[in-house]
C-alpha cells in the first residue's frame, strides 16, 4: 500500500517542480524589468536622469561645502560638477533640437570660473555671489528648454545626512 502512495507523491513533486520551472521561465521573460539573462543594453540615460544623477547632487554639495567654508571639498565638488556637465554634453549633444554644449556654456561657464576663483581665494562672499549666479544660470537654461517649472535653489539644508560638510579639524 505504501508503494502506490509514495509513487503518487513522487509524481506530484515532479509535476509541481516542472510547473514551477515553466512558470519561473515564463515570469522572467514577462518581467517588466526584462530578461535577466539577456545581454545588457548600452547605457543611454535621458537628460532628466543625467541631471538628477550627475548635476543636482554636485550642485548641492558644492553649495554646502562653500557654506561650511570647506574649500578643499568645494574645489573637489566644483571639479566634479564641471565633469558632470561635460558628460551630459557628450551623452546628449542635442536636446529638443538645441545644442547642449552651447546651452551649458552659456548658462554656467562664467559662474563656474568665478566659483573657481572664490574657492582658491577662500573668499566666502564671492563664493556666495558666484554660486547664486550658477543657480540662476541653471534656471535660465531650464527656462530656455521649456522646463521653467524645474527651479533650482541654493540649498538650505543637507540632503546628505551621511556626509560632513564642515572642514575637518
Where are these regions (language model features)?
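C-terminal ends of transmembrane alpha-helices
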Residues: 24-25, 146
Amino acid at each position: 500500500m505504501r508503494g502506490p502512495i509514495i509513487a503518487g507523491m513522487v509524481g506530484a513533486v515532479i509535476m509541481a517542480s516542472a510547473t514551477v520551472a515553466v512558470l519561473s521561465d515564463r515570469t522572467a521573460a514577462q518581467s517588466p524589468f526584462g530578461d535577466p539573462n539577456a545581454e545588457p543594453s548600452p547605457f543611454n540615460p535621458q537628460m532628466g536622469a543625467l541631471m538628477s544623477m550627475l548635476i543636482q547632487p554636485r550642485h548641492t554639495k558644492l553649495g554646502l561645502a562653500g557654506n561650511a567654508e570647506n574649500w578643499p571639498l568645494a574645489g573637489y565638488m566644483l571639479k566634479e560638477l564641471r565633469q558632470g556637465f561635460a558628460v551630459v554634453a557628450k551623452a546628449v549633444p542635442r536636446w529638443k533640437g538645441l545644442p547642449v554644449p552651447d546651452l551649458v556654456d552659456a548658462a554656467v561657464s562664467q559662474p563656474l570660473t568665478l566659483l573657481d576663483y572664490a574657492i582658491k581665494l577662500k573668499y566666502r562672499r564671492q563664493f556666495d555671489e558666484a554660486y547664486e549666479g550658477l543657480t540662476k544660470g541653471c534656471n535660465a537654461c531650464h527656462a530656455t528648454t521649456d522646463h521653467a517649472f524645474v527651479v533650482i535653489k541654493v540649498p538650505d539644508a543637507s540632503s546628505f545626512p551621511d556626509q560632513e560638510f564642515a572642514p575637518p579639524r
